[in-house]
């Protein structure tokens, strides 16, 4: 049987087969008279149905772009980062916790240690979670003390009981429900940096830090949730453990998940979408990637809270060359945005890929995108997790497509529907590895 038996051959007479498509380099915006001054422009938008943005910037779910450091930096500037999934479920959940604890009005679920812990346990815990203070509780969760990095600075004996170095007597605490203004007064009057919050039974319910209060005052543009924590999203794959991964991420405090595949207009993707939405109906689920109006309508009607548009436009993506599949990015964004509006399916559109210059961001938004996802533009900054390489006296960071062999070896095979293939020689890469000059 011929492979093309039921496929219409390409003819210039069929507009569905041959049509004009535009990418960012093909167009410019024509200026017109405006009553709005630049400083009066609002950059607020949406990442997904219920997740707002103060700037329409999202960092890509790539293992050389977004881990906790990048997600924290992006959220502080008003955007959101999508943590990549080339790590274990536990590691990805830990990355979420790092972002949620980076700054907040009050840490709802602070890291704690038991009374049987040692100095070594405390030092390891502080290093692992990038924190400077740990409440000490008993088996019932009753607050018994607090240990800070100042208490441990000159401690050489790792086996010394934590009860011998913690502050246990005359411990300063705050009652449950205290306002940030009153908490700040307590911190200032007692010259302390950590303030445990307890209920009427003296059970630990939270932790307020002076740094978090200072950040709340200095970074009004930061993208934060209802209790003052930085927002963060994380990627899922079309895998058997997708719901398990989503559950761990939700428990860690993730604000949204992204079902991240090279071809989102498939039965398998919608099956995962429905499973995740059934298990977590309040969780926003973004789905991608797609390139057509039909795909956007299909996913929106299936329950997606946003769609991610872009097949092959990225600088290190070779899908269009290897698979012969794709669509000019600007036209794809325009058609998806128009189709959702015409069908009264009001979910955000994320333009993913092909953004080489700042002007491309403007063009994408003008075409109908609610926000843009950046990869290469962020790969060369200090917050990106890529390996630093020195070449001819200049510093670079490695940057690779999630369809590269190197990335697929670390967990992204399912994104390109090759997760059943264990022989590296049989993998068909749809991405390359490159270097990005580190920006000073």
Where are these regions (language model features)?
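Short beta-strand/loop segments at the ligand-binding rim of alpha/beta enzyme cores
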Residues: 54-57, 106, 226-234, 278-291, ...
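Bateman/CBS regulatory modules and CBS-like beta-alpha motifs in cytosolic regions of diverse proteins
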Residues: 39-53, 60-62, 91-129, 136-138, ...
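An N-cap/entry alpha-helix motif that binds or orients negatively charged groups
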Residues: 2-57, 89-91, 109
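Glycine-rich beta-to-alpha transition loops that act as phosphate-gripper elements at the mouths
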Residues: 61-66, 113-117, 174-178, 235-240, ...
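Active-site-adjacent beta->alpha loops and helix N-cap segments on the catalytic face
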Residues: 89-95, 210-221, 243, 262-280, ...
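Catalytic cores of alpha/beta
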Residues: 70-71, 244-245, 249, 292-305, ...
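Conserved small/polar residues in nucleotide/adenosyl-binding loops
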Residues: 438-440
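Glycine-rich phosphate-binding active-site loops on the catalytic face of alpha/beta enzymes
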Residues: 82-88, 261-265, 309-323, 357, ...
């Amino acid at each position: 049987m011929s492979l093309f038996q039921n496929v219409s051959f390409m003819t210039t007479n069929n507009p569905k087969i041959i049509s004009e498509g535009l990418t960012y380099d093909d167009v410019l915006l024509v200026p017109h008279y405006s009553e709005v001054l630049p400083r009066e422009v609002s950059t607020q938008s949406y990442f997904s149905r219920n997740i707002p943005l103060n700037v329409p910037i999202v960092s890509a779910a790539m293992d050389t772009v977004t881990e906790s450091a990048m997600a924290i930096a992006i959220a502080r500037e008003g955007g959101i980062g999508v943590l990549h999934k080339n790590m274990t479920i536990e590691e990805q959940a830990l990355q979420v916790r790092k972002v949620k604890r980076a700054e907040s009005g009050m840490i709802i679920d602070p890291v704690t240690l038991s009374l049987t812990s040692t100095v070594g346990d405390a030092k390891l815990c502080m290093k692992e979670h990038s924190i400077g203070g740990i409440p000490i509780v008993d088996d019932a969760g009753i607050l018994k003390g607090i240990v800070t990095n100042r208490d441990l600075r000159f401690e050489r004996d790792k086996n010394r009981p934590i009860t011998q170095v913690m502050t246990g007597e005359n411990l300063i605490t705050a009652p449950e429900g205290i306002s940030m203004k009153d908490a700040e007064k307590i911190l200032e009057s007692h010259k302390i940096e950590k303030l445990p919050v307890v209920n009427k039974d003296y059970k630990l319910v939270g932790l307020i830090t002076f740094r978090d209060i200072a950040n709340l005052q200095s970074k009004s543009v930061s993208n934060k949730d209802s209790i003052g924590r930085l927002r963060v999203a994380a990627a899922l794959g079309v895998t058997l453990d997708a719901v398990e991964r989503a559950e761990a991420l939700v428990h860690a405090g993730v604000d949204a998940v992204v079902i991240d595949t090279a071809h989102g207009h498939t039965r398998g993707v919608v099956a995962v979408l429905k499973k995740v939405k059934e298990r977590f109906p309040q969780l926003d689920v973004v789905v991608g990637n797609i390139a057509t109006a039909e795909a956007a309508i299909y996913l929106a009607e299936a329950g997606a809270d946003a769609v991610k548009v872009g097949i092959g436009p990225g600088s290190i993506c070779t899908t269009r060359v290897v698979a012969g599949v794709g669509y000019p990015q600007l036209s794809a964004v325009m058609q998806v945005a128009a189709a959702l509006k015409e069908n009264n399916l009001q979910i955000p559109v994320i333009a993913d890929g092909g953004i080489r210059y700042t002007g491309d961001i403007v063009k994408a938004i003008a075409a109908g995108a609610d926000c843009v996802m950046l990869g290469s533009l962020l790969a060369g900054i200090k917050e990106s997790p890529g390996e630093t390489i020195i070449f001819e006296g200049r510093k670079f960071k490695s940057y690779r497509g999630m369809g590269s062999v190197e990335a697929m070896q670390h967990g992204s095979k399912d994104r390109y529907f090759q997760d059943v293939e264990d022989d590296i020689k049989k993998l068909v890469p749809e991405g390359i590895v490159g270097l990005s000059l580190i920006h000073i």
